[in-house]
Swiss-Prot record:
<keyword id="KW-0813">Transport</keyword>
<dbReference type="InterPro" id="IPR020547">
    <property type="entry name" value="ATP_synth_F1_esu_C"/>
</dbReference>
<comment type="similarity">
    <text>Belongs to the ATPase epsilon chain family.</text>
</comment>
<keyword id="KW-0139">CF(1)</keyword>
<dbReference type="InterPro" id="IPR036794">
    <property type="entry name" value="ATP_F1_dsu/esu_C_sf"/>
</dbReference>
<dbReference type="InterPro" id="IPR020546">
    <property type="entry name" value="ATP_synth_F1_dsu/esu_N"/>
</dbReference>
<dbReference type="GO" id="GO:0045259">
    <property type="term" value="C:proton-transporting ATP synthase complex"/>
</dbReference>
<dbReference type="InterPro" id="IPR036771">
    <property type="entry name" value="ATPsynth_dsu/esu_N"/>
</dbReference>
<keyword id="KW-1003">Cell membrane</keyword>
<dbReference type="GO" id="GO:0005886">
    <property type="term" value="C:plasma membrane"/>
</dbReference>
<protein>
    <recommendedName>
        <fullName>ATP synthase epsilon chain</fullName>
    </recommendedName>
</protein>
<dbReference type="GO" id="GO:0046933">
    <property type="term" value="F:proton-transporting ATP synthase activity, rotational mechanism"/>
</dbReference>
<keyword id="KW-0066">ATP synthesis</keyword>
<comment type="function">
    <text>Produces ATP from ADP in the presence of a proton gradient across the membrane.</text>
</comment>
<dbReference type="Pfam" id="PF00401">
    <property type="entry name" value="ATP-synt_DE"/>
</dbReference>
<dbReference type="GO" id="GO:0005524">
    <property type="term" value="F:ATP binding"/>
</dbReference>
<keyword id="KW-0406">Ion transport</keyword>
Amino acid sequence: MRTLEVSVVTPGGPVLEESFEMVVCKAETGEIGILPGHIPLVSPLQISAVRLKKGNDTKYLAISGGFMEVQPEKVTILAQSAETASDINVQRAKEAKDRAERRLQAKKDNIDKTRAELALKRAINRLDVGK
């Protein structure tokens, strides 16, 4: 079966460079599946899991937004952060989730609600991928 070269890069450097048969990401317009030969496109990505399929194996990455560039035989994901399931510290993600929930429940005026909501989404995404 044909494959795509997939590169996932963060400001800290490359996270993954490998070949896969299919890439599934959550773009701003909804979930998108990429197969070899896909038309070129650039799309912003949401905080979500990226599914990378090769044969019967599926690898998951937790990404915190970014962009995806698609060429017929290559997918490049430029993300603010990206972690493989094995790299996620589940305990730390649970603590981040609890902290964000407490901030959102607090009735203080000085809370940046948008920032707390994004932190909660990132923590939930990391927990989902890390399990």
